[in-house]
């Protein structure tokens, strides 16, 4: 399979730079996986699409203000993007600079350069940085960090993004990108879903900056997926098994929930799914056998991204590309602050040939 098979034309004007005034007021394109049929509506239509007893799976990670600006003590501006917090004093990060800092280099971080840190080691493209400060990494980031808006949102972050680029149920700090399908859920909608009898449970996957890395190979099978930490606790496993047992659906909110659930299923020894607390490098593309997820709520993804490949593996390649073509024609808003899709699983997707 070639990366270019997942390309599509997207006018710049369809990239959303701000969210809708109300979280749940975005548009919703529904794709019936088995038939490919499309339905246009609004996000609150989910209420009619979900049945009592269906299980909604959310990712409760919380975005940290992961972008820092500053300079090397020896001169030279730098930009630091946290990939993950290692402990209370250390981070693993991407560093942009005209010349990469060497181990032992002193860094002055923050818009006022008030925070002192040391680059202690390099691991491939990533740098280990230790803060020389009494406060914890999280306190420092909350104090001097900027919200790490994706590269395609071409504007500086604003104070409002600290709330807008965060799900209302976010709980565990550690992500450097929001699980964006969840941004559309507000408290009134969650309340109505609960009242209808829809079950809810949470995984945690701390989205890394690698989620924005382009696929740099021509052939999909050659791509090496970035690693992210995921947690699928026992209560989540119990909720999945109970939903399946009563004939209800497991509905993943976002590709990060999909990757968490399917990672836990891949690692399971004795049951459909078992608790999972580990790094995952799961790469889902056409031909993948889904084991847990029956339906998916997701935003519109970048051309040639691993995420449009994941959706194609779920709904079928042709159905997915047709849906994206329709979304462009109907002027849906794309990417993190854009509109959403509701997709049901296509069991025939695994047999579909792509690019032939």
Swiss-Prot record:
<dbReference type="GO" id="GO:0002099">
    <property type="term" value="P:tRNA wobble guanine modification"/>
</dbReference>
<keyword id="KW-0808">Transferase</keyword>
<dbReference type="GO" id="GO:0051075">
    <property type="term" value="F:S-adenosylmethionine:tRNA ribosyltransferase-isomerase activity"/>
</dbReference>
<protein>
    <recommendedName>
        <fullName>S-adenosylmethionine:tRNA ribosyltransferase-isomerase</fullName>
        <ecNumber>2.4.99.17</ecNumber>
    </recommendedName>
</protein>
<dbReference type="GO" id="GO:0008616">
    <property type="term" value="P:queuosine biosynthetic process"/>
</dbReference>
<comment type="similarity">
    <text>Belongs to the QueA family.</text>
</comment>
<dbReference type="InterPro" id="IPR042118">
    <property type="entry name" value="QueA_dom1"/>
</dbReference>
<dbReference type="GO" id="GO:0005737">
    <property type="term" value="C:cytoplasm"/>
</dbReference>
<keyword id="KW-0963">Cytoplasm</keyword>
<comment type="subunit">
    <text>Monomer.</text>
</comment>
<comment type="function">
    <text>Transfers and isomerizes the ribose moiety from AdoMet to the 7-aminomethyl group of 7-deazaguanine (preQ1-tRNA) to give epoxyqueuosine (oQ-tRNA).</text>
</comment>
<comment type="pathway">
    <text>tRNA modification; tRNA-queuosine biosynthesis.</text>
</comment>
<keyword id="KW-0949">S-adenosyl-L-methionine</keyword>
<dbReference type="Pfam" id="PF02547">
    <property type="entry name" value="Queuosine_synth"/>
</dbReference>
<dbReference type="InterPro" id="IPR003699">
    <property type="entry name" value="QueA"/>
</dbReference>
<keyword id="KW-0671">Queuosine biosynthesis</keyword>
<dbReference type="InterPro" id="IPR036100">
    <property type="entry name" value="QueA_sf"/>
</dbReference>
<dbReference type="InterPro" id="IPR042119">
    <property type="entry name" value="QueA_dom2"/>
</dbReference>
